[in-house]
From Swiss-Prot:
Residue spans, topological domain Cytoplasmic: 1-82
Annotated InterPro entries: B30.2/SPRY, B30.2/SPRY_sf, ConA-like_dom_sf, SPRY_dom, SPRY_Ssh4-like, Ubq-SigPath_Reg
Chain intervals for the UniProt region annotation (Disordered): 385-417, 449-507
Protein name: Protein ssh4
Family listed: Belongs to the SSH4 family.
Key words of the record: Endosome, Glycoprotein, Membrane, Protein transport, Signal-anchor, Transmembrane, Transmembrane helix, Transport, Vacuole
Length: 507
């Protein structure tokens, strides 16, 4: 075979190869030998073959021949198919891992009605009864009795069985007082905690919870409140959260239906009396726990020292939740409903408190602001006049005059004779020389006093008239000790006889 007729790369740059020349010379033999053709016109087929061959060889100008084929297209398709298969495999692997982690970490709260052998495959009542039976086996007598007591209370008083919506009077109280309308009210029968200043709670040595008097409103998007742990021994368990009414207050919040709480151990409880789920860091003295509620979505979340934790409750839209704090030992917790700043900055900026700090009720008027009031002005003037008159009377007289009380009987004239005892009125005038002027002066200078005040008032000054023995000096009337003794009766009679005879002798 000649070089120019050899098949290979040289055939592309030179003359047509042997295969090409043979096809060109005898195209019909090539077609008949290769594949059987259907019964068609032979001339048309021959023309088509010649046209194809001419198109392949007409552009040979000494360079590379532009051969059109499907080699590049098939390579691109192969690469595309490989990439798509790789992405598909990765997607399937990601989906498998997502399903695995979903079933592993979110088993609580799911209800399966099929028989796949996982916990929670029954409905709520059956699952709760099974968990209750398992927990009662490991409880001690005290815990079992407390649980049965709480269970009896819940059965007799189902959650939300009482009217807890904010009434008109409560709404008006909130409008007047603001956030000060909320306060904790301990149960009198339990009496294991003491509330001071509406929001400062002190617990004692047994398990107890305390609720507020008003529920959390539902008008705004978010409501938020905080509780600060002031005193907490290590052995005390504190539970801070939300409950509905009625609730067994001898149990902690979160242990029974429609209640949720953040425990001081770092766990959370939501309608769960048997086991707690890990939630956040443990609480110590000085920590601040916040509770937030979104009424529109029914979501409840917690914060710790100003840092938001994950949501705990979803879909609780219809319940009326009450802020609740409980403990099983001595501790002190102070609650902030919005009367001061929050530790959680977002709640502080967006004003998520239960109500405004100040209500519409005006404070009492300050001292000295009665100048514009006629009633207060008249009362002030009358009081000033009375005090001035009393002061002047006290200065003009050494004693305060107390007028006698008026008799409830008919009014008597001054000339009527009364059988009532007359009060002794000392006089500065002579006895028997009475006059109206003297009586008037005596009345003006005399005070009618109560019997209890007679011992405290000194007697009035008194001087006897001239010539009266009552006014003479007592010491002058006393006999002189140095004078001779008093003569006897006989001597006195003899002296009297001598005195009677002496005038006769003179005559």
């Amino acid at each position: 075979m000649r070089g120019s007729e050899a098949s290979g790369p040289g055939a592309i740059f030179g003359a047509p190869s042997t295969l090409t020349t043979s096809v060109i010379r005898n195209p019909t033999s090539f077609l008949s030998s290769s594949t059987p053709l259907p019964s068609t016109d032979a001339d048309v087929i021959a023309q088509n073959v010649e046209h194809v061959l001419l198109s392949l060889t007409s552009h040979n100008d000494g360079g590379l021949v532009g051969v059109s084929g499907n080699s590049s297209g098939s390579t691109g398709k192969g690469i595309l198919i490989g990439v798509l298969s790789a992405f598909g495999s990765a997607t399937v692997a990601v989906l498998v891992l997502a399903i695995f982690f979903f079933f592993k970490y979110t088993r609580r709260g799911r209800i399966f009605l099929d028989r796949i052998g996982r916990p929670g495959e029954f409905d709520d009542e059956q699952a709760f009864a099974r968990e209750e039976a398992e927990a009662l086996e490991v409880m001690d007598d005290m815990a079992r009795s407390e649980y049965m007591r709480a269970k009896s209370f819940v059965e007799a008083n189902p959650p939300e069985s009482m009217q807890t919506d904010i009434s008109l009077s409560q709404f008006l109280a909130i409008q007047e007082k603001g956030v000060s309308a909320w306060e904790f009210q301990p149960e009198l029968e339990i009496a294991n905690c003491f509330v001071e200043g509406r929001t400062e709670i002190e617990f004692y040595d047994s398990e107890c919870s305390v609720q507020t008097n008003l529920p959390v409103p539902k008008q705004n998007d978010v409501y938020y409140w905080e509780a600060k742990i002031y005193e907490k021994p290590e052995s005390t368990l504190i539970s801070i959260g939300m409950t509905t009414k009625p609730y067994p207050l001898f149990r902690l919040p979160g242990f029974h239906k429609t209640s949720v709480a953040y425990l001081s151990t770092g766990h959370r409880r939501y309608n769960q009396p048997f086991s707690a789920s890990p939630y956040g860091p443990a609480l110590a003295q000085g920590d601040v726990v916040g509770v937030g509620y979104r009424p529109r979505s029914g979501t409840i979340f917690f914060t710790r020292n100003g840092k938001k934790l994950e949501d705990v409750v979803h879909g609780a839209k219809t319940q009326n939740f009450f802020p609740t704090v409980g403990a099983n030992g001595p501790c002190t917790v102070h609650v902030n409903f919005g009367q001061m700043g929050f530790v959680f900055i977002e709640a502080n900026v967006k004003k998520w408190g239960l109500a405004p700090m100040t209500g519409s009720l005006a404070p009492p008027p300050p001292y000295g602001s009665e100048q514009g009031s006629i009633l207060l002005e008249s009362g002030r003037e009358s009081a000033a006049q009375i005090s001035q008159r009393v002061y002047q009377d006290a200065r003009t007289s050494s004693t305060v005059r107390i007028p006698p009380s008026r008799s409830p009987g008919p009014v008597r004239s001054p000339t009527d004779i009364s059988l009532a005892p007359l009060a002794h009125i000392p006089s500065h005038e002579d006895v028997g020389e009475g006059s109206s002027h003297a009586n008037t002066i005596a009345d003006e200078q005399t005070a009618l006093l109560n019997p209890t005040d007679l011992d405290q008032v000194p007697p009035p000054e008194y001087s006897s008239p001239d010539g009266s023995r009552r006014g003479s000096d007592i010491t002058g009337d006393l006999p002189n000790q140095s004078s001779p003794p008093i003569p006897s009766y006989d001597a006195a009679v003899g002296n009297q006889a001598d005195n009677t005879l002496r005038p006769d002798g003179d005559h």
